[in-house]
């Protein structure tokens, strides 16, 4: 990644470098929390109207460098970078295409998220109700509400999964979803918003799993 903008690039390389540092710091904290095991997980930030900064595939999230953050267009194609973006890039870019206000998408694989995805796969969703922390989600101003978190079937065909996500987005507002046996996607208008949604869902999923244990269901 060059220190100055290259005229041949269709995006601002300085901006990409800034976002790389912003993402690397946050991703490192997620890695320390154990949410990105074995090079899993991928993270992105809107670069401009037509491009996204996203993690390169297969990199250890504990020790990322600028070269581990690349640019893709809104179709998920690499732009100005020799490396390959995450196989799940389409799940990021579909959100940026659909919602111009979205600025950041986070995909993690914590133990809590993965176990919850298995437990609730049959139901197809998890209903989070009457938690004070529901106020952490954009558009929620009271605990007296219910947030449905979808659980999608895992597939290696990202086009199929993206279509399923789009279909549900036509029906309901959501700030995250689980993939069975996989992990969780969260997003927001800013990195801070996306992180708040991620941390809130992580905590609430942990609450739900602990309630199931206390009631003898797990």
UniProtKB/Swiss-Prot annotation:
Note accompanying the cofactor annotation:
Binds 1 zinc ion per subunit.
Cystine pairs annotated here are none
Q: Which pathway is it part of?
A: Amino-acid biosynthesis; L-methionine biosynthesis via salvage pathway; L-methionine from S-methyl-5-thio-alpha-D-ribose 1-phosphate: step 2/6
Quote the protein name from its UniProt record: Methylthioribulose-1-phosphate dehydratase
A Pfam family found in this protein is: Aldolase_II
Stored InterPro entries: Aldolase_II/adducin_N (IPR001303), Aldolase_II/adducin_N_sf (IPR036409), MethylthioRu-1-P_deHdtase_MtnB (IPR017714)
For the keyword Amino-acid biosynthesis, the answer is yes
Reaction(s) this enzyme catalyzes, per UniProt: 5-(methylsulfanyl)-D-ribulose 1-phosphate = 5-methylsulfanyl-2,3-dioxopentyl phosphate + H2O
| UniProt entry tagged with the keyword Acyltransferase | no
Keyword set, alphabetical order: Amino-acid biosynthesis, Lyase, Metal-binding, Methionine biosynthesis, Zinc
Q: Name one GO molecular function term.
A: methylthioribulose 1-phosphate dehydratase activity
Q: What is its EC number?
A: 4.2.1.109
Q: Which cofactors, if any, are listed as required?
A: Zn(2+)
Q: Where is the signal peptide?
A: none
The gene behind this protein is: mtnB
Q: Which residues bind Zn(2+)?
A: 107, 109
This protein's GO CC annotations: cytoplasm
Q: Which organism is it from?
A: Xylella fastidiosa (strain 9a5c)
